[in-house]
Regions:
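N-terminal hydrophobic/helix-forming segments and targeting peptides
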Residues: 1-170
């Protein structure tokens, strides 16, 4: 807190109580070399990209091979964001979320991350292979990684009992 708080009573005097939401300053900035730095970028940028793609499909009247649904969650970080029922006929879901970089990982900030497995287990083999094929066919630089300490919304979709193929990119 940006206040002089030492006790529960001090916090309550400011109108703060247990159960209140905590919102962190995202610390957004653009570096001299043009990089965007901020907390929570994965969700914001993923959402913007998906909304931009939806607008492109609509404006250009692009006919897709199958129906595409966008599902945005606000409970991702607590593990049940993707638990909502999926529309009838949906056989595959992709989570667009994590693009981790760091020690022990192959991906860089300039690549699409294809996740083969996370803390919930492996992603659908056919979906992962399709993601790799599509990246290659479209000249998209990518890396395949495993995130043993992370989970995704599409993992929650499976745990909710939805029998679908699933994948994760970031």
């Amino acid at each position: 807190l940006d206040e002089d708080v030492k006790t529960k009573a001090d916090a309550e005097a400011l109108g703060i109580m247990a159960g209140d939401y905590v919102c962190f300053e995202p610390r957004f900035r653009v570096t001299e070399k043009g990089y965007i730095k901020s907390r929570f970028l994965d969700d914001k940028l993923s959402s913007a990209i998906l909304m931009g793609y939806a607008r492109y499909l609509k404006d250009e009247k692009v006919a897709t091979k199958r129906r595409i649904y966008l599902h945005f969650t606000i409970y991702e970080e607590v593990g049940h964001g993707g638990c909502a029922p999926v529309p009838q006929g949906v056989t595959e879901a992709w989570s667009v979320d994590m693009g981790c970089v760091g020690q022990g990982l192959s991906c860089t900030e300039h690549q699409v991350s294809i996740c083969a497995k996370d803390s919930g287990g492996p992603y659908n083999y056919d979906v992962v292979k399709t993601q790799i094929r599509l990246a290659k066919e479209n000249g998209i630089d990518f890396a395949v990684d495993i995130y043993p300490h992370y989970g995704s919304d599409v993992e929650a979709t499976l745990k909710a009992g939805n029998d679908i193929r699933h994948g994760l990119i970031g």
